Amino acid sequence: MVAEHQASPANVRVKRIAGALGAEVLGLNCAKTLSGADVGALHRALTDHLVVSLPDQTMSLDDLERLTDQLGGRMVTPFVKALDDRPYVIRVLKERADKLNFANAWHSDLTYLPEPPSFTLLYAHEVPDYGGDTLFQNQYLAYETLSDGLKQTLRGLRAVHSAGAAYGTGGYLDQVKQHMSTPVAPSPDAFKEVVHPIVVTHPESGKPALFVNPVYTVRIEGWSHGESQALLQYLYKHGLNENFTCRVRWAKGTLTIWDNRATQHNALNDYAGQRREMYRTSVAGAAPKAA
C-alpha cells in the first residue's frame, strides 16, 4: 500500500542530510507519548527519506520501547543478549579497551528471519569525541540504477539468507566475542536458512528495492556458490556506491530510526580508546514481497 502524503504538524520540521537518503527531524519530543499526528509525520519522513535522525532527545528505555510500539510493535533480536529486564532492548557497547565494535560491516538487520524488522531504532547514550558515525545506503537506488535487462533477471530470483557465518557456533562473532563488549550469543540455530526475493516491493512506498546484503545473504536459490557470488558481489559493488549513501554523526541524545526494508548500514570503527554506548530496538515487520 502506498503511503498517503498528508501535511505534517506545524511543530515538525524535516531537513535533508544528503541527496540519496537521510533527514533530520526536529520538533518532536520522544520522551513523551507522541500524538497520532506526530507518529504519522515521523512515519512519512521515514517513507520519504528512509533514515531519520532526531537530535537532542532525553529518553529513558521506557520511552524507547513506547516509541517502538507506536511505530509497529517490538520484536526480539536473536543471537544478541538483551538487557536482563528488557527482552526487546539490546545495548550496543564498545568499551575503551575494545578493538572491535558491533555491526562494522554493510548489512540489513535480521534478514535471516522469515519476517525481518521494518524499522530499527538506535539511541545514543554515550558517544566518542570523534568517529563512531553510521553509514546508510539506499536500496531503491541500488535497484533503480541497474540495467533493464539485469532488473528483469533479478525479479525472477530469490536469495537464501542465514545468520550462520556471523552468529553460528564457530562463526565470526563466536571467534571474536571476547574482544567485544556487546554481548552476543552464538548458536547452532543461526545456521537455519530462509529465502527472500532479491527484489522486493516496499509495502508503503510501493517502490522496488534490492534485498540482499553481504553479511546475511548466502547464495541465490538454485545457483551454485560460484555463480551466486559472481552476481551477488557485483550487486554489492554496484549498490554500495558512495553516491547512494548518507552519514549520521552521533551526539549524546541522538535517536536515529531507519527503514530496514530499503537500506543497509555500517557502524564505523574509527574511535580507538573511546567509549560508545547505544540502545537498540527493532520494530516487527512482515515477510518481504516480490516486486
Regions found by a protein language model. Name each.
Residues V2-L255, N260-A291:
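Non-heme Fe(II) oxygenase catalytic core, chiefly the N-lobe of the double-stranded beta-helix
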